[in-house]
A protein has these predicted regions:
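Iron-sulfur cluster-binding cysteine motifs and their immediate structural context
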Residues: 169-177
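Small-residue-enriched alpha-helical segments and adjacent helix-cap loops
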Residues: 2, 27-161, 167
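Intrinsically disordered, low-complexity polar/charged tails and linkers
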Residues: 1-22, 39
């Protein structure tokens, strides 16, 4: 009986990247806008302990990777993560997970709701196949902490100030805008 050949391209498309150690994969997770719930973090920790080597790697794009997942554990890992609301990310020539700063939800300078926008972009575009990988980034204000220009499409929040001298309290917002 012929041995079943492993489809590495499909695994990579689903966020599983081959490691240099034979039979092991690093799983990239979908972390939209850099936000995870406490439950998401718990299940990621459990998977890293049970199926990996007890740690995760934080990527430069607000992502998480769980290294040292054995090939034979991949389906169990996906099921366990799904039970905690965590989805695998993607690799290769696809739209990647959308990154975002805290925006108006928590940052004093935030002009837009970056997380809601990141979720919308992710819902419409995540995982779409393209000729090359494609990255979205959403930053909430002109401080540009997310470095919008370093993405293929960066969105930067801003405001239009309606200056009325009689209402001015010298807050400085119009100077920053």
């Amino acid at each position: 009986m012929a041995e079943k050949k492993t489809d590495y391209a499909s695994l990579k498309k689903g966020g599983f990247m081959r490691q240099k150690q034979k039979g092991y994969f690093s799983l990239r997770l979908q972390v939209v806008g850099g936000n995870l719930t406490a439950e998401n973090i718990r299940v990621v920790s459990e998977v890293a302990d049970e199926y990996g080597k007890g740690y995760v790697h934080m990527t430069s794009r607000q992502g998480i990777e769980i290294p040292f997942i054995r090939f034979e554990d991949i389906e169990e890992v996906k099921a366990k993560l799904a039970s905690g609301g965590v989805k695998p990310g993607v690799c290769g020539p696809r739209v990647r997970t959308v990154t975002a700063c805290q925006g108006a939800a928590g940052c004093p300078s935030g002009c837009i709701d970056t997380y809601e926008l990141a979720k919308e972009l992710d819902a419409h575009y995540f995982g779409r196949e393209l000729p090359h990988k494609f990255k979205f980034g959403v930053t909430g204000c002109q401080n540009n902490c997310l470095k919008a220009e370093e993405n293929d499409l960066g969105i930067k929040g801003g405001m239009i100030v309606n200056y009325k001298e009689e209402d001015c309290i010298q807050c400085g917002v119009c100077v920053k805008a």
